[in-house]
Amino acid sequence: VSQIAGELDMTKGALYRHYKSKRDIFDCIVQRMEQQDGEQATEYDMPQEDKEKTPEKYETVSLDDFVEYSKSMFEYWTEDDFASSFRKMLTIEQFRSEEMQNLYQQYLVAGPASYVKDLFDSMKITNAKNKAVRFYAVMHFYYSLYDGAEDKENVKDEFVSAIKSLVQELK
C-alpha cells in the first residue's frame, strides 16, 4: 500500500480515503490490467475474447500481425511501469495464495500460452500447442532476463531476434 501511495504521490491515509480496503485497491488494479490488456489487443487488432466466443476474430490474424503484437506486449510487460509492477507482484505473490496463482497463470503462463495456441491453430500451424509453448516460453524467459539486465535495449534486441528465429521455424 505504501508503494502504491508513493506512486500516486499521496499518503497511505489519502489512499484509504479513496478506497475502502486493500482488497478494493487490488480489485481496481486487476480491473485496470484487464482494461489495458483490452486496449493493447484493440490497438493491434487482436482478439480479446476466447476463441470459442469470437472464432472469426482469430481467423483474420496473420503471423506477421501476431509478431508485431508480441513485440508490443514484450515492451508493455517490461517497460510500462504499471504492467511491469503487476507482473512482478504476481510472480512473487503466486506462492502465497491460490487466487494469486490463478491470476499469475491467467496473465503470465497458461492464459497467454493458450491464446497463442488458439492463434496458431487458426493460422493452420501444425503442432500448434507445442509451438505456442515454445513461442511463449521465449517471451516469458526474456521478461525475466530483462528485469535483471543492465543493458535492457540489448535484451530487447535479443528477444526480437529470438522471435524472428522462431517465426522462421513456423513458416
Model-found features: residue ranges?
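Hydrophobic/aromatic-rich alpha-helical bundle segments in the mid-to-C-terminal region
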Residues: 102-106, 110, 119-166
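Amphipathic alpha-helical segments that line or abut small-molecule/effector binding pockets
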Residues: 56-79, 84, 88, 92, ...
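Hydrophobic recognition helices of helix-based DNA-binding modules
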Residues: 8, 26-29, 33, 37, ...
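Amphipathic alpha-helical linker/stalk segments
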Residues: 27-69
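N-terminal hydrophobic signal/anchor transmembrane helix of membrane proteins
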Residues: 45-47, 162-171
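Amphipathic alpha-helical packing segments from all-alpha helical-bundle domains
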Residues: 64, 78-124
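Helix-turn-helix
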Residues: 1-32
